[in-house]
Amino acid sequence: MKRAGRTMVERTSKFLLIVAASVCFMLILYQYVGPGLSLGAPSGRPYAEEPDLFPTPDPHYVKKYYFPVRELERELAFDMKGEDVIVFLHIQKTGGTTFGRHLVQNVRLEVPCDCRPGQKKCTCYRPNRRETWLFSRFSTGWSCGLHADWTELTNCVPGVLGRRESAPNRTPRKFYYITLLRDPVSRYLSEWRHVQRGATWKTSLHMCDGRTPTPEELPSCYEGTDWSGCTLQEFMDCPYNLANNRQVRMLADLSLVGCYNMSFIPENKRAQILLESAKKNLKDMAFFGLTEFQRKTQYLFERTFNLKFIRPFMQYNSTRAGGVEVDNDTIRRIEELNDLDMQLYDYAKDLFQQRYQYKRQLERMEQRIKNREERLLHRSNEALPKEETEEQGRLPTEDYMSHIIEKW
């Protein structure tokens, strides 16, 4: 009887070794085959009452760019009680306001952000001390300037927090940059409508290499206080319009091209350097989401930082840009004006989809392995002789324990 039990344990051990080897093989295989493999669904996640909350991975997705597995995993050991800080780079008209509110109002935290009525900023302290873990518009305000870009934030954030939260002999902070991107045509039209209603970002600093640009380096598209009432044609005709390729400019290291000095290097070379810099910085960010994929954005953020949202994200397709009727010629013109953004978005969308595919499929594979182990354990328990099962499950009673003590 005992021999039969040992045989069953040996079989179980061999099976688990085979399963472990299979997992390693599948991870190696993914590197070459890509995310087309269908590997299964997540387990133990929130929103169990909504099994279809996150879209099923597309088994027919064809990737455009090659990314090694290390670029797809993106699971960080974010330590809110340590020195880690999330820095949100908010690009205009990408849905950043909604996402920023999610960060301060919708994350399940040990110590929730303190958001009081009538106040524009929330207090987001760490659970163990009065220091912020989030650098964003709705937590620290525009501390590095209105809609500060990558160049500004990376040079400004450490100093700002160092002055606000100085402490002797402290461990250096670790910054995790995040952002949202949007389809360039939709984003451009949304910005035009925003400007048409009288909005401006003229208080933005555009700080680069320790100074702001001169009026000659960054001319204005309009005279007066704002550009309200401008037509789409007027908006497109301004050669200095910062709406053109805004996403690339705000994600690139502008120091590489002489900041806003257009005569620093030839225009074609400048454009290529900016695009490659934006791609690199985006890829190296801790996380980025896409406005067009709210649920996938939520999913990737949660898995990257191991933080859960209280309420699921909603996908709103009826935006102001969506209500603008433009002909095909105008769309092509907008695409030309935003050619760098179009290339960046194509790159970002593919990386985003590959990360989503990878994480979802990995979770499904882990769930399959877990289910197999549970079935194997159940079968092994059923296979044990009845007497042995009863003997293993018998609990010592008080009389039985007294008998043992007396005998001893």
From Swiss-Prot:
The chain crosses the membrane at residues 15-35. Residues 36-408 are lumenal. GO terms for cellular component: membrane. N-glycosylated. InterPro entries: Heparan_SO4-6-sulfoTrfase, P-loop_NTPase, Sulfotransferase. It catalyses: alpha-D-glucosaminyl-[heparan sulfate](n) + 3'-phosphoadenylyl sulfate = 6-sulfo-alpha-D-glucosaminyl-[heparan sulfate](n) + adenosine 3',5'-bisphosphate + H(+). GO terms for molecular function: heparan sulfate 6-sulfotransferase activity. The keyword Signal does not apply. Its main location: membrane. Residues 376-396 are annotated as: Disordered. It is found in: Membrane. Keywords: Coiled coil, Glycoprotein, Membrane, Signal-anchor, Transferase, Transmembrane, Transmembrane helix. 3'-phosphoadenylyl sulfate binds at residues 90-98, 182, 190, 314-316, 320-321. GO terms for biological process: limb development; neuron development. Substrate binds at K120, K121, R137, W142, H147, H194, W201. Its EC number is 2.8.2.-. Glycans are attached at N261, N317, N328. Residues 8-14 are cytoplasmic. The active site is at H147. Residues 348-382 form a coiled coil. It is a single-pass type II membrane protein. Belongs to the sulfotransferase 6 family. 6-O-sulfation enzyme which catalyzes the transfer of sulfate from 3'-phosphoadenosine 5'-phosphosulfate (PAPS) to position 6 of the N-sulfoglucosamine residue (GlcNS) of heparan sulfate. May also play a role in limb development. This is Heparan-sulfate 6-O-sulfotransferase 1. The lineage of its organism: Eukaryota, Metazoa, Chordata, Craniata, Vertebrata.
